[in-house]
Amino acid sequence: MEMLTAICGCVMAVQSLIAVSVADDAYAREARAFLANRDKTVQPRQIAEIRKAARGETNDLAAVRSARNVMAALPEGVTAEWVTPKMRLYRLQGKDKLPLLVYLHGGGWVIGSIASCSAFCGAVAKEGVAVLALDYPLAPEHPYPAALDAVCSAYREIVTHPSRFGCDPNRVTIGGDSSGGNLALTAALALQQEGLKPAALLPYYPVTEARVDGTISWREFDTGFGMDGAFMEACNAAYLQGRDWADPLISPMCATDDELRKLPSVHILGADHDVLRDQGKAFADRLKSLGCRVRYELPRGTTHLYITVPGQPSVFRRAVQFAVEACLQSDRKN
């Protein structure tokens, strides 16, 4: 009997490894196709306009931003309500007191909008988690701390008036991709100064240090992998505008050990071929070393943008599943 149990255990382990291998192959194959088909002129134009805007020449930045402002169609059974002109609430029809994900789009704090994350928000809502997308103010017109202040203000509004958002105030997760993931982490650090604590945090390939970090992933994937290092560098400059990158409310990796220990559970899904890969992994490793509740996954072969730009459907589906897992497991007492 013991031998049979051991054999069954080995078979299950092999099946799990095969499933992971198949998923990794799909992730890598789709990422290669995504990069091969991507318009190579988009990012250089974005970088040039962001740098100009940081110098005060903002006339052409609107055109760059508009490219990521197309709202996705809603999945069947999902409604989307403009709670305010800056907040869009996604949820299943007729459902109330749901766990809520406050979602913050990526785009280097400079581009992106509620529309750019709309497909993701709708997909998560389809699975029974309400999602509130926040259109936070963008740099360089509104540099740090404008976006952070908007996120914290939205969180206070949600937990103070949960019926307005149809949610359980004890199960409010804050998440986002790239710079949005940064805002999720920094908002939690800022809110803890007020005695407020989200149920969980859900950053996807987050910025944890707003600087050129010199890591292996930054050097290896600096150009041609979805988000160039030069793009991130231009966005950092537009957002900081001379402020100290090492401020923990800009770079959460710079928070003290005590501050990090007070965070709720953190669920990080990275991107493999990405300049931000290593800083995200380092942040997760630090949380683990401090005894924090952290879940970290790195889907092999993936690249930046899988949340907001179509083309990597397998990891997009995993990202949706990852969000649902985080939100349904969330508990304010964590």
Where does each model-flagged region fall?
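Bacterial Sec-dependent signal peptides at the C-terminal "C-region" and cleavage site
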Residues: 8-23
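Alpha/beta-hydrolase superfamily serine-hydrolase fold, recognizing
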Residues: 20-334
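Bacterial N-terminal signal peptides that target proteins for export
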Residues: 1-6
